[in-house]
Amino acid sequence: MLSAEDFSDQVLRLLPLLRRWRRCEHALWDPRARRLQLSVATARNSARFDVRVDLHPLYAVPQLLLRYWEPDPAVSEYEVWKLHFVDPYQLPLWQPGRFSIALDQVPATSGSAYETWYVVNSCDTDANVGPETDNYMLRWFSLYGQLLDENLGFTLAAALVAPCTDQKKA
């Protein structure tokens, strides 16, 4: 479990790494809502995911939400993207069977409305990531981020080793 302060602090430390991630087209931290928002391209750059990471209000663990966009072939004059809702296990994700994913209505980014998102179940997060709060978000994104990029876990795991290597040189 993470406190809201730990969640915010760790996401802010993770943000520069996510912005260097080759598939991340946009990364934004909303301090008021304590929400991480990303736009991520698929492997073949043929579709996009809106990614939202919130702190689950009940479990106090990160919650991954996804929306899937594809280009609209009916419009050829300019690029238009359409929001698609398909079976969660038909999404172009890497090993989606590792996690329970379902469509759900969640509070909108702003206002009192609700939006439909794919939600990755948060129940087993501590069992998957471990309960230690140090580097929790880095470990979490190394695991759950693999849905979007199978190599992301290796990239972020290297960041865990780098501080140890730097300290040994001093």
Curated annotation (Swiss-Prot):
Pfam families: Autophagy_act_C. It comes from the Eukaryota. The keyword Isomerase does not apply. GO terms for cellular component: phagophore assembly site membrane. GO terms for molecular function: Atg12 transferase activity. Its EC number is 2.3.2.-. Coiled coil: none annotated. The active site is at C123 (glycyl thioester intermediate). Keywords: Autophagy, Membrane, Protein transport, Transferase, Transport, Ubl conjugation pathway. Disulfide bonds: none annotated. InterPro entries: Atg10 (IPR016524), Atg3/Atg10 (IPR007135). It is found in: Preautophagosomal structure membrane. It is a peripheral membrane protein. One of its GO terms (biological process) is protein transport. Belongs to the ATG10 family. Forms homooligomers. E2-like enzyme required for the cytoplasm to vacuole transport (Cvt), autophagy and nucleophagy. Acts as an E2-like enzyme that catalyzes the conjugation of ATG12 to ATG5. ATG12 conjugation to ATG5 is required for proper localization of ATG8 to the preautophagosomal structure (PAS). Likely serves as an ATG5-recognition molecule. This is Ubiquitin-like-conjugating enzyme ATG10. The lineage of its organism: Eukaryota, Fungi, Dikarya, Ascomycota, Saccharomycotina.
